[in-house]
Amino acid sequence: MRKNILITGASTGLGEGMAREWAAKGCNLALCARRADKLEALQRELQQANPNIRVLVRGLDVCDYDQVFEVFRAFRDELGSLDRVVVNA
């Protein structure tokens, strides 16, 4: 069964690198960060390289406590479950 991985701070650095690694391993990804433009570019790249996975993106500022839970719930609802959450931001 394909794993569903949520990564915060996924638009650059370690988060971006982890997204690439898990995409290459066939995991579905839920990516969030403040820079939605960078997330969308990463989404296109990952989906093109790995057409059998789902890559969802949402803007998120982890300093907004309520928004964190709202975004996590939305990802879970869309994917059906979250198998791993990487708090990188």
Where are these regions (language model features)?
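Aromatic pocket-lining residues of Rossmann-like dinucleotide-binding sites
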Residues: 22
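The beta1-alpha1 cofactor-binding region of Rossmann-like NAD(H)/NADP(H)-dependent oxidoreductases
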Residues: 59-70
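Conserved glycine-rich Rossmann-like NAD(P)H-binding loop of the short-chain dehydrogenase/reductase
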Residues: 25-42
